[in-house]
Amino acid sequence: MSIFINADSKIIVQGMTGSEGTKHTRRMLASGSKVVGGVTPGKGGQSVEIDGHNLPVFNTVGEAMAATGANVSVVFVPPKFAKAAVIDAIDAAMPLIVVITEGIPVHDSASFYAYSLTKGTSRIIGPNCPGLISPGKSNVGIIPANITGAGPIGLVSKSGTLTYQMMFELRDIGFSTAVGIGGDPVVGTTHIDCLRAFQDDPETEAIVMIGEIGGDAEERAAAFIAEYVTKPVVGYVAGFTAPEGKTMGHAGAIVSGSSGTAQGKKDALEAAGVKVGQTPSETARLLRAIMGR
């Protein structure tokens, strides 16, 4: 099994006619994902030919869902148009909305996330995330499909590049699903959401959680793990050498005073029984030891 996506996921690409949308649609198709169309307001009725796939373009997500049966949307839309694109998907009751776009104003992200909660029909992953992959089943976003395989590990990460590294480090064991939740201050799906889903997934045997400095998401995840998660969890927290007050890569990755430090997050996770590596490679070794692999 997998979480959030599976072999039957039907994907539409919001912004498919743009350069990034086209490029990553091609890559998703090559990895076996079922991309069934795209959405670009004003270009409805057109089609896009990508590597032998003739993909229809629609004006709205609702039109695309009605015509294709799509149940996943991935958003490759410039930041200033992203809020409208996500609202369109929420209004259409799209079950899963994966927002890849980086640089969306925090107020816009908070607005569409709050709106999604009032509707109660859509899960948002992101923004500013690489998406998610269930190897051999579906790949939604920009995660390379050729760096790993299917297996019993669940991965949730704030960082795209660390997602890729961990998937490669553990490629011989493989993953049920890897989810990049994004590193912005406001995201639609949290570590806890993914931990809960992996705990409930019968084919996920162990979990890797990657966090980073800033905020208290990792501390809250640690409390959740202590109370709810019975499967083995290993972790890594990026940013041990980060200077105070400087944003490191992601908008949410910033240490303020004693709040949000890597050491504080590591301590909280270890208190919950999570083995935490000092490097991604050490984290992978910890998981191998737990799984006897």
Language-model features and meaning:
Residues 1-293:
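Catalytic-core regions of core metabolic enzymes
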